[in-house]
Amino acid sequence: EIHREKKPVRQFKGRTEKSAKIFYYPMLALIYNGVPSNDKDEIALEICCQLLSNSQKTGILDKLQLDGDIMSVGASQNAMRDAGILMINAIPSFDANQNRWDSHKSVEKIVLSSLRQLQNGEFDEATLEAIKQNMIREYDLQMESNEMKAYILASLFNTGADPSDIVNFKEKVKAVTIDEVKAVAKKYFNDNYLALNIQEAKNLDSKGQKLKKPDYKPIETKKGAKSEYAKWVESIPVNMPEVKYCDFNSIQQKQINTRSKLFYNLNPENDVFTMTLKYGIGTKKMPKLEYAVALMNNAGMLPDIEPLAFKRAMGELNANCTYAVDDNYMYVMMSGYEKDLVKACQLLSKQILFPKLDDKQLQSLIGSAFGSRQMEKSSIGTLESALTSYVLYKDSSDYLQRIPTRDLIDLSITDLTTQFQAAT
């Protein structure tokens, strides 16, 4: 073990504010002191962050995005070896009519108002249980991936954690009580935090100041020589793993009707299912699908089911649903536990048939598109992408085929709902 001098971690006292012009668009970050990895409060704090925002969009902060009050917002925990932080990131909405971003001050006020619900313990046992089940399902999915397993093993080395903590993760999550979560939320999400106002900067891609070379000579390595450490690593025996190839013959096919076909395969790893509905239409023929699909990710259900209520209904079934679209196809992707597959499919079918899109979300989406397109001319990366796309595809380039900026303001809920229903 490497012995290092541990310096005391700075604790925020009251509200501290810092500002910096370092990005293409404004952002707000609220940063709180957290805990180091392996701390007894780490899992409870992760649950707190999930109560604020999660992949199912059922969190307290997720509601701000679903309601169109903020363009994007999320909470996360970063627990390192010696210290940790809790961070809330938010992107203000862009008002296309007034051609301006909402202020950092107004966004911070909205976020803090919602955060008080967590600080005051305003959540019930059912909500907490849904969050815990979602964390367990995501853990099961990670265990299907060799890449994620390797990442977890590397994190054990970095943080000095006990491997049994990973094996027993699900049991530890199940054991966390609502009283523990409320106590931890009140302890760490307090009035002591750093408010980082990241402001829009001009000419970020312009050529910067040229730095002088350092005064010292570079370290010269001996060509062909090996360090003792390299020799030790090479001496470690490596056993070749048994490669298990995919057996495509195990995939079952069934014709549902004249236009639909089912492909099915059993998941031998766990009880988690993943399902993808693939429709043979994309933005190449229906450009407005880009915006209809974006709204579907935060949609409710007719006649009167609001977006958050629909998300929580999915959450109670421990299912997660997302919509996506590319040039040629539209996708509806859902994952969850097999025991709730039928109920989750029934709920999803109702939303596909009777979507309830939100006008406030549409205005936020239009504002986001306006803001993004305004920054394109000052972004070398975007200009390079546009030029490459034109060289490859000429007039069929996505940048030329997309909806003109002047027409975005005319998008309506009725039109986008019709587009989505026509695609399905």
Locate predicted features.
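Non-catalytic, conformational "gating/processing" segments within enzyme and secreted inhibitor domains
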Residues: E1, N192-Y193, S389, S396, ...
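Proteolytic maturation boundary segments
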Residues: E1-A20, P26, D62, D165-Y279
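Glycine-rich, charged/polar anion/phosphate-binding loops
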Residues: F12-E17, N33, M71-S76, E180-K182, ...
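M16 family metallopeptidases and their MPP-like homologs
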Residues: Y25-P36, D62-K174, A195-Q199, K207-K210, ...
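Peptidyl-prolyl cis-trans isomerase
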Residues: V176-E180, V184, K356-L362, L408-L416
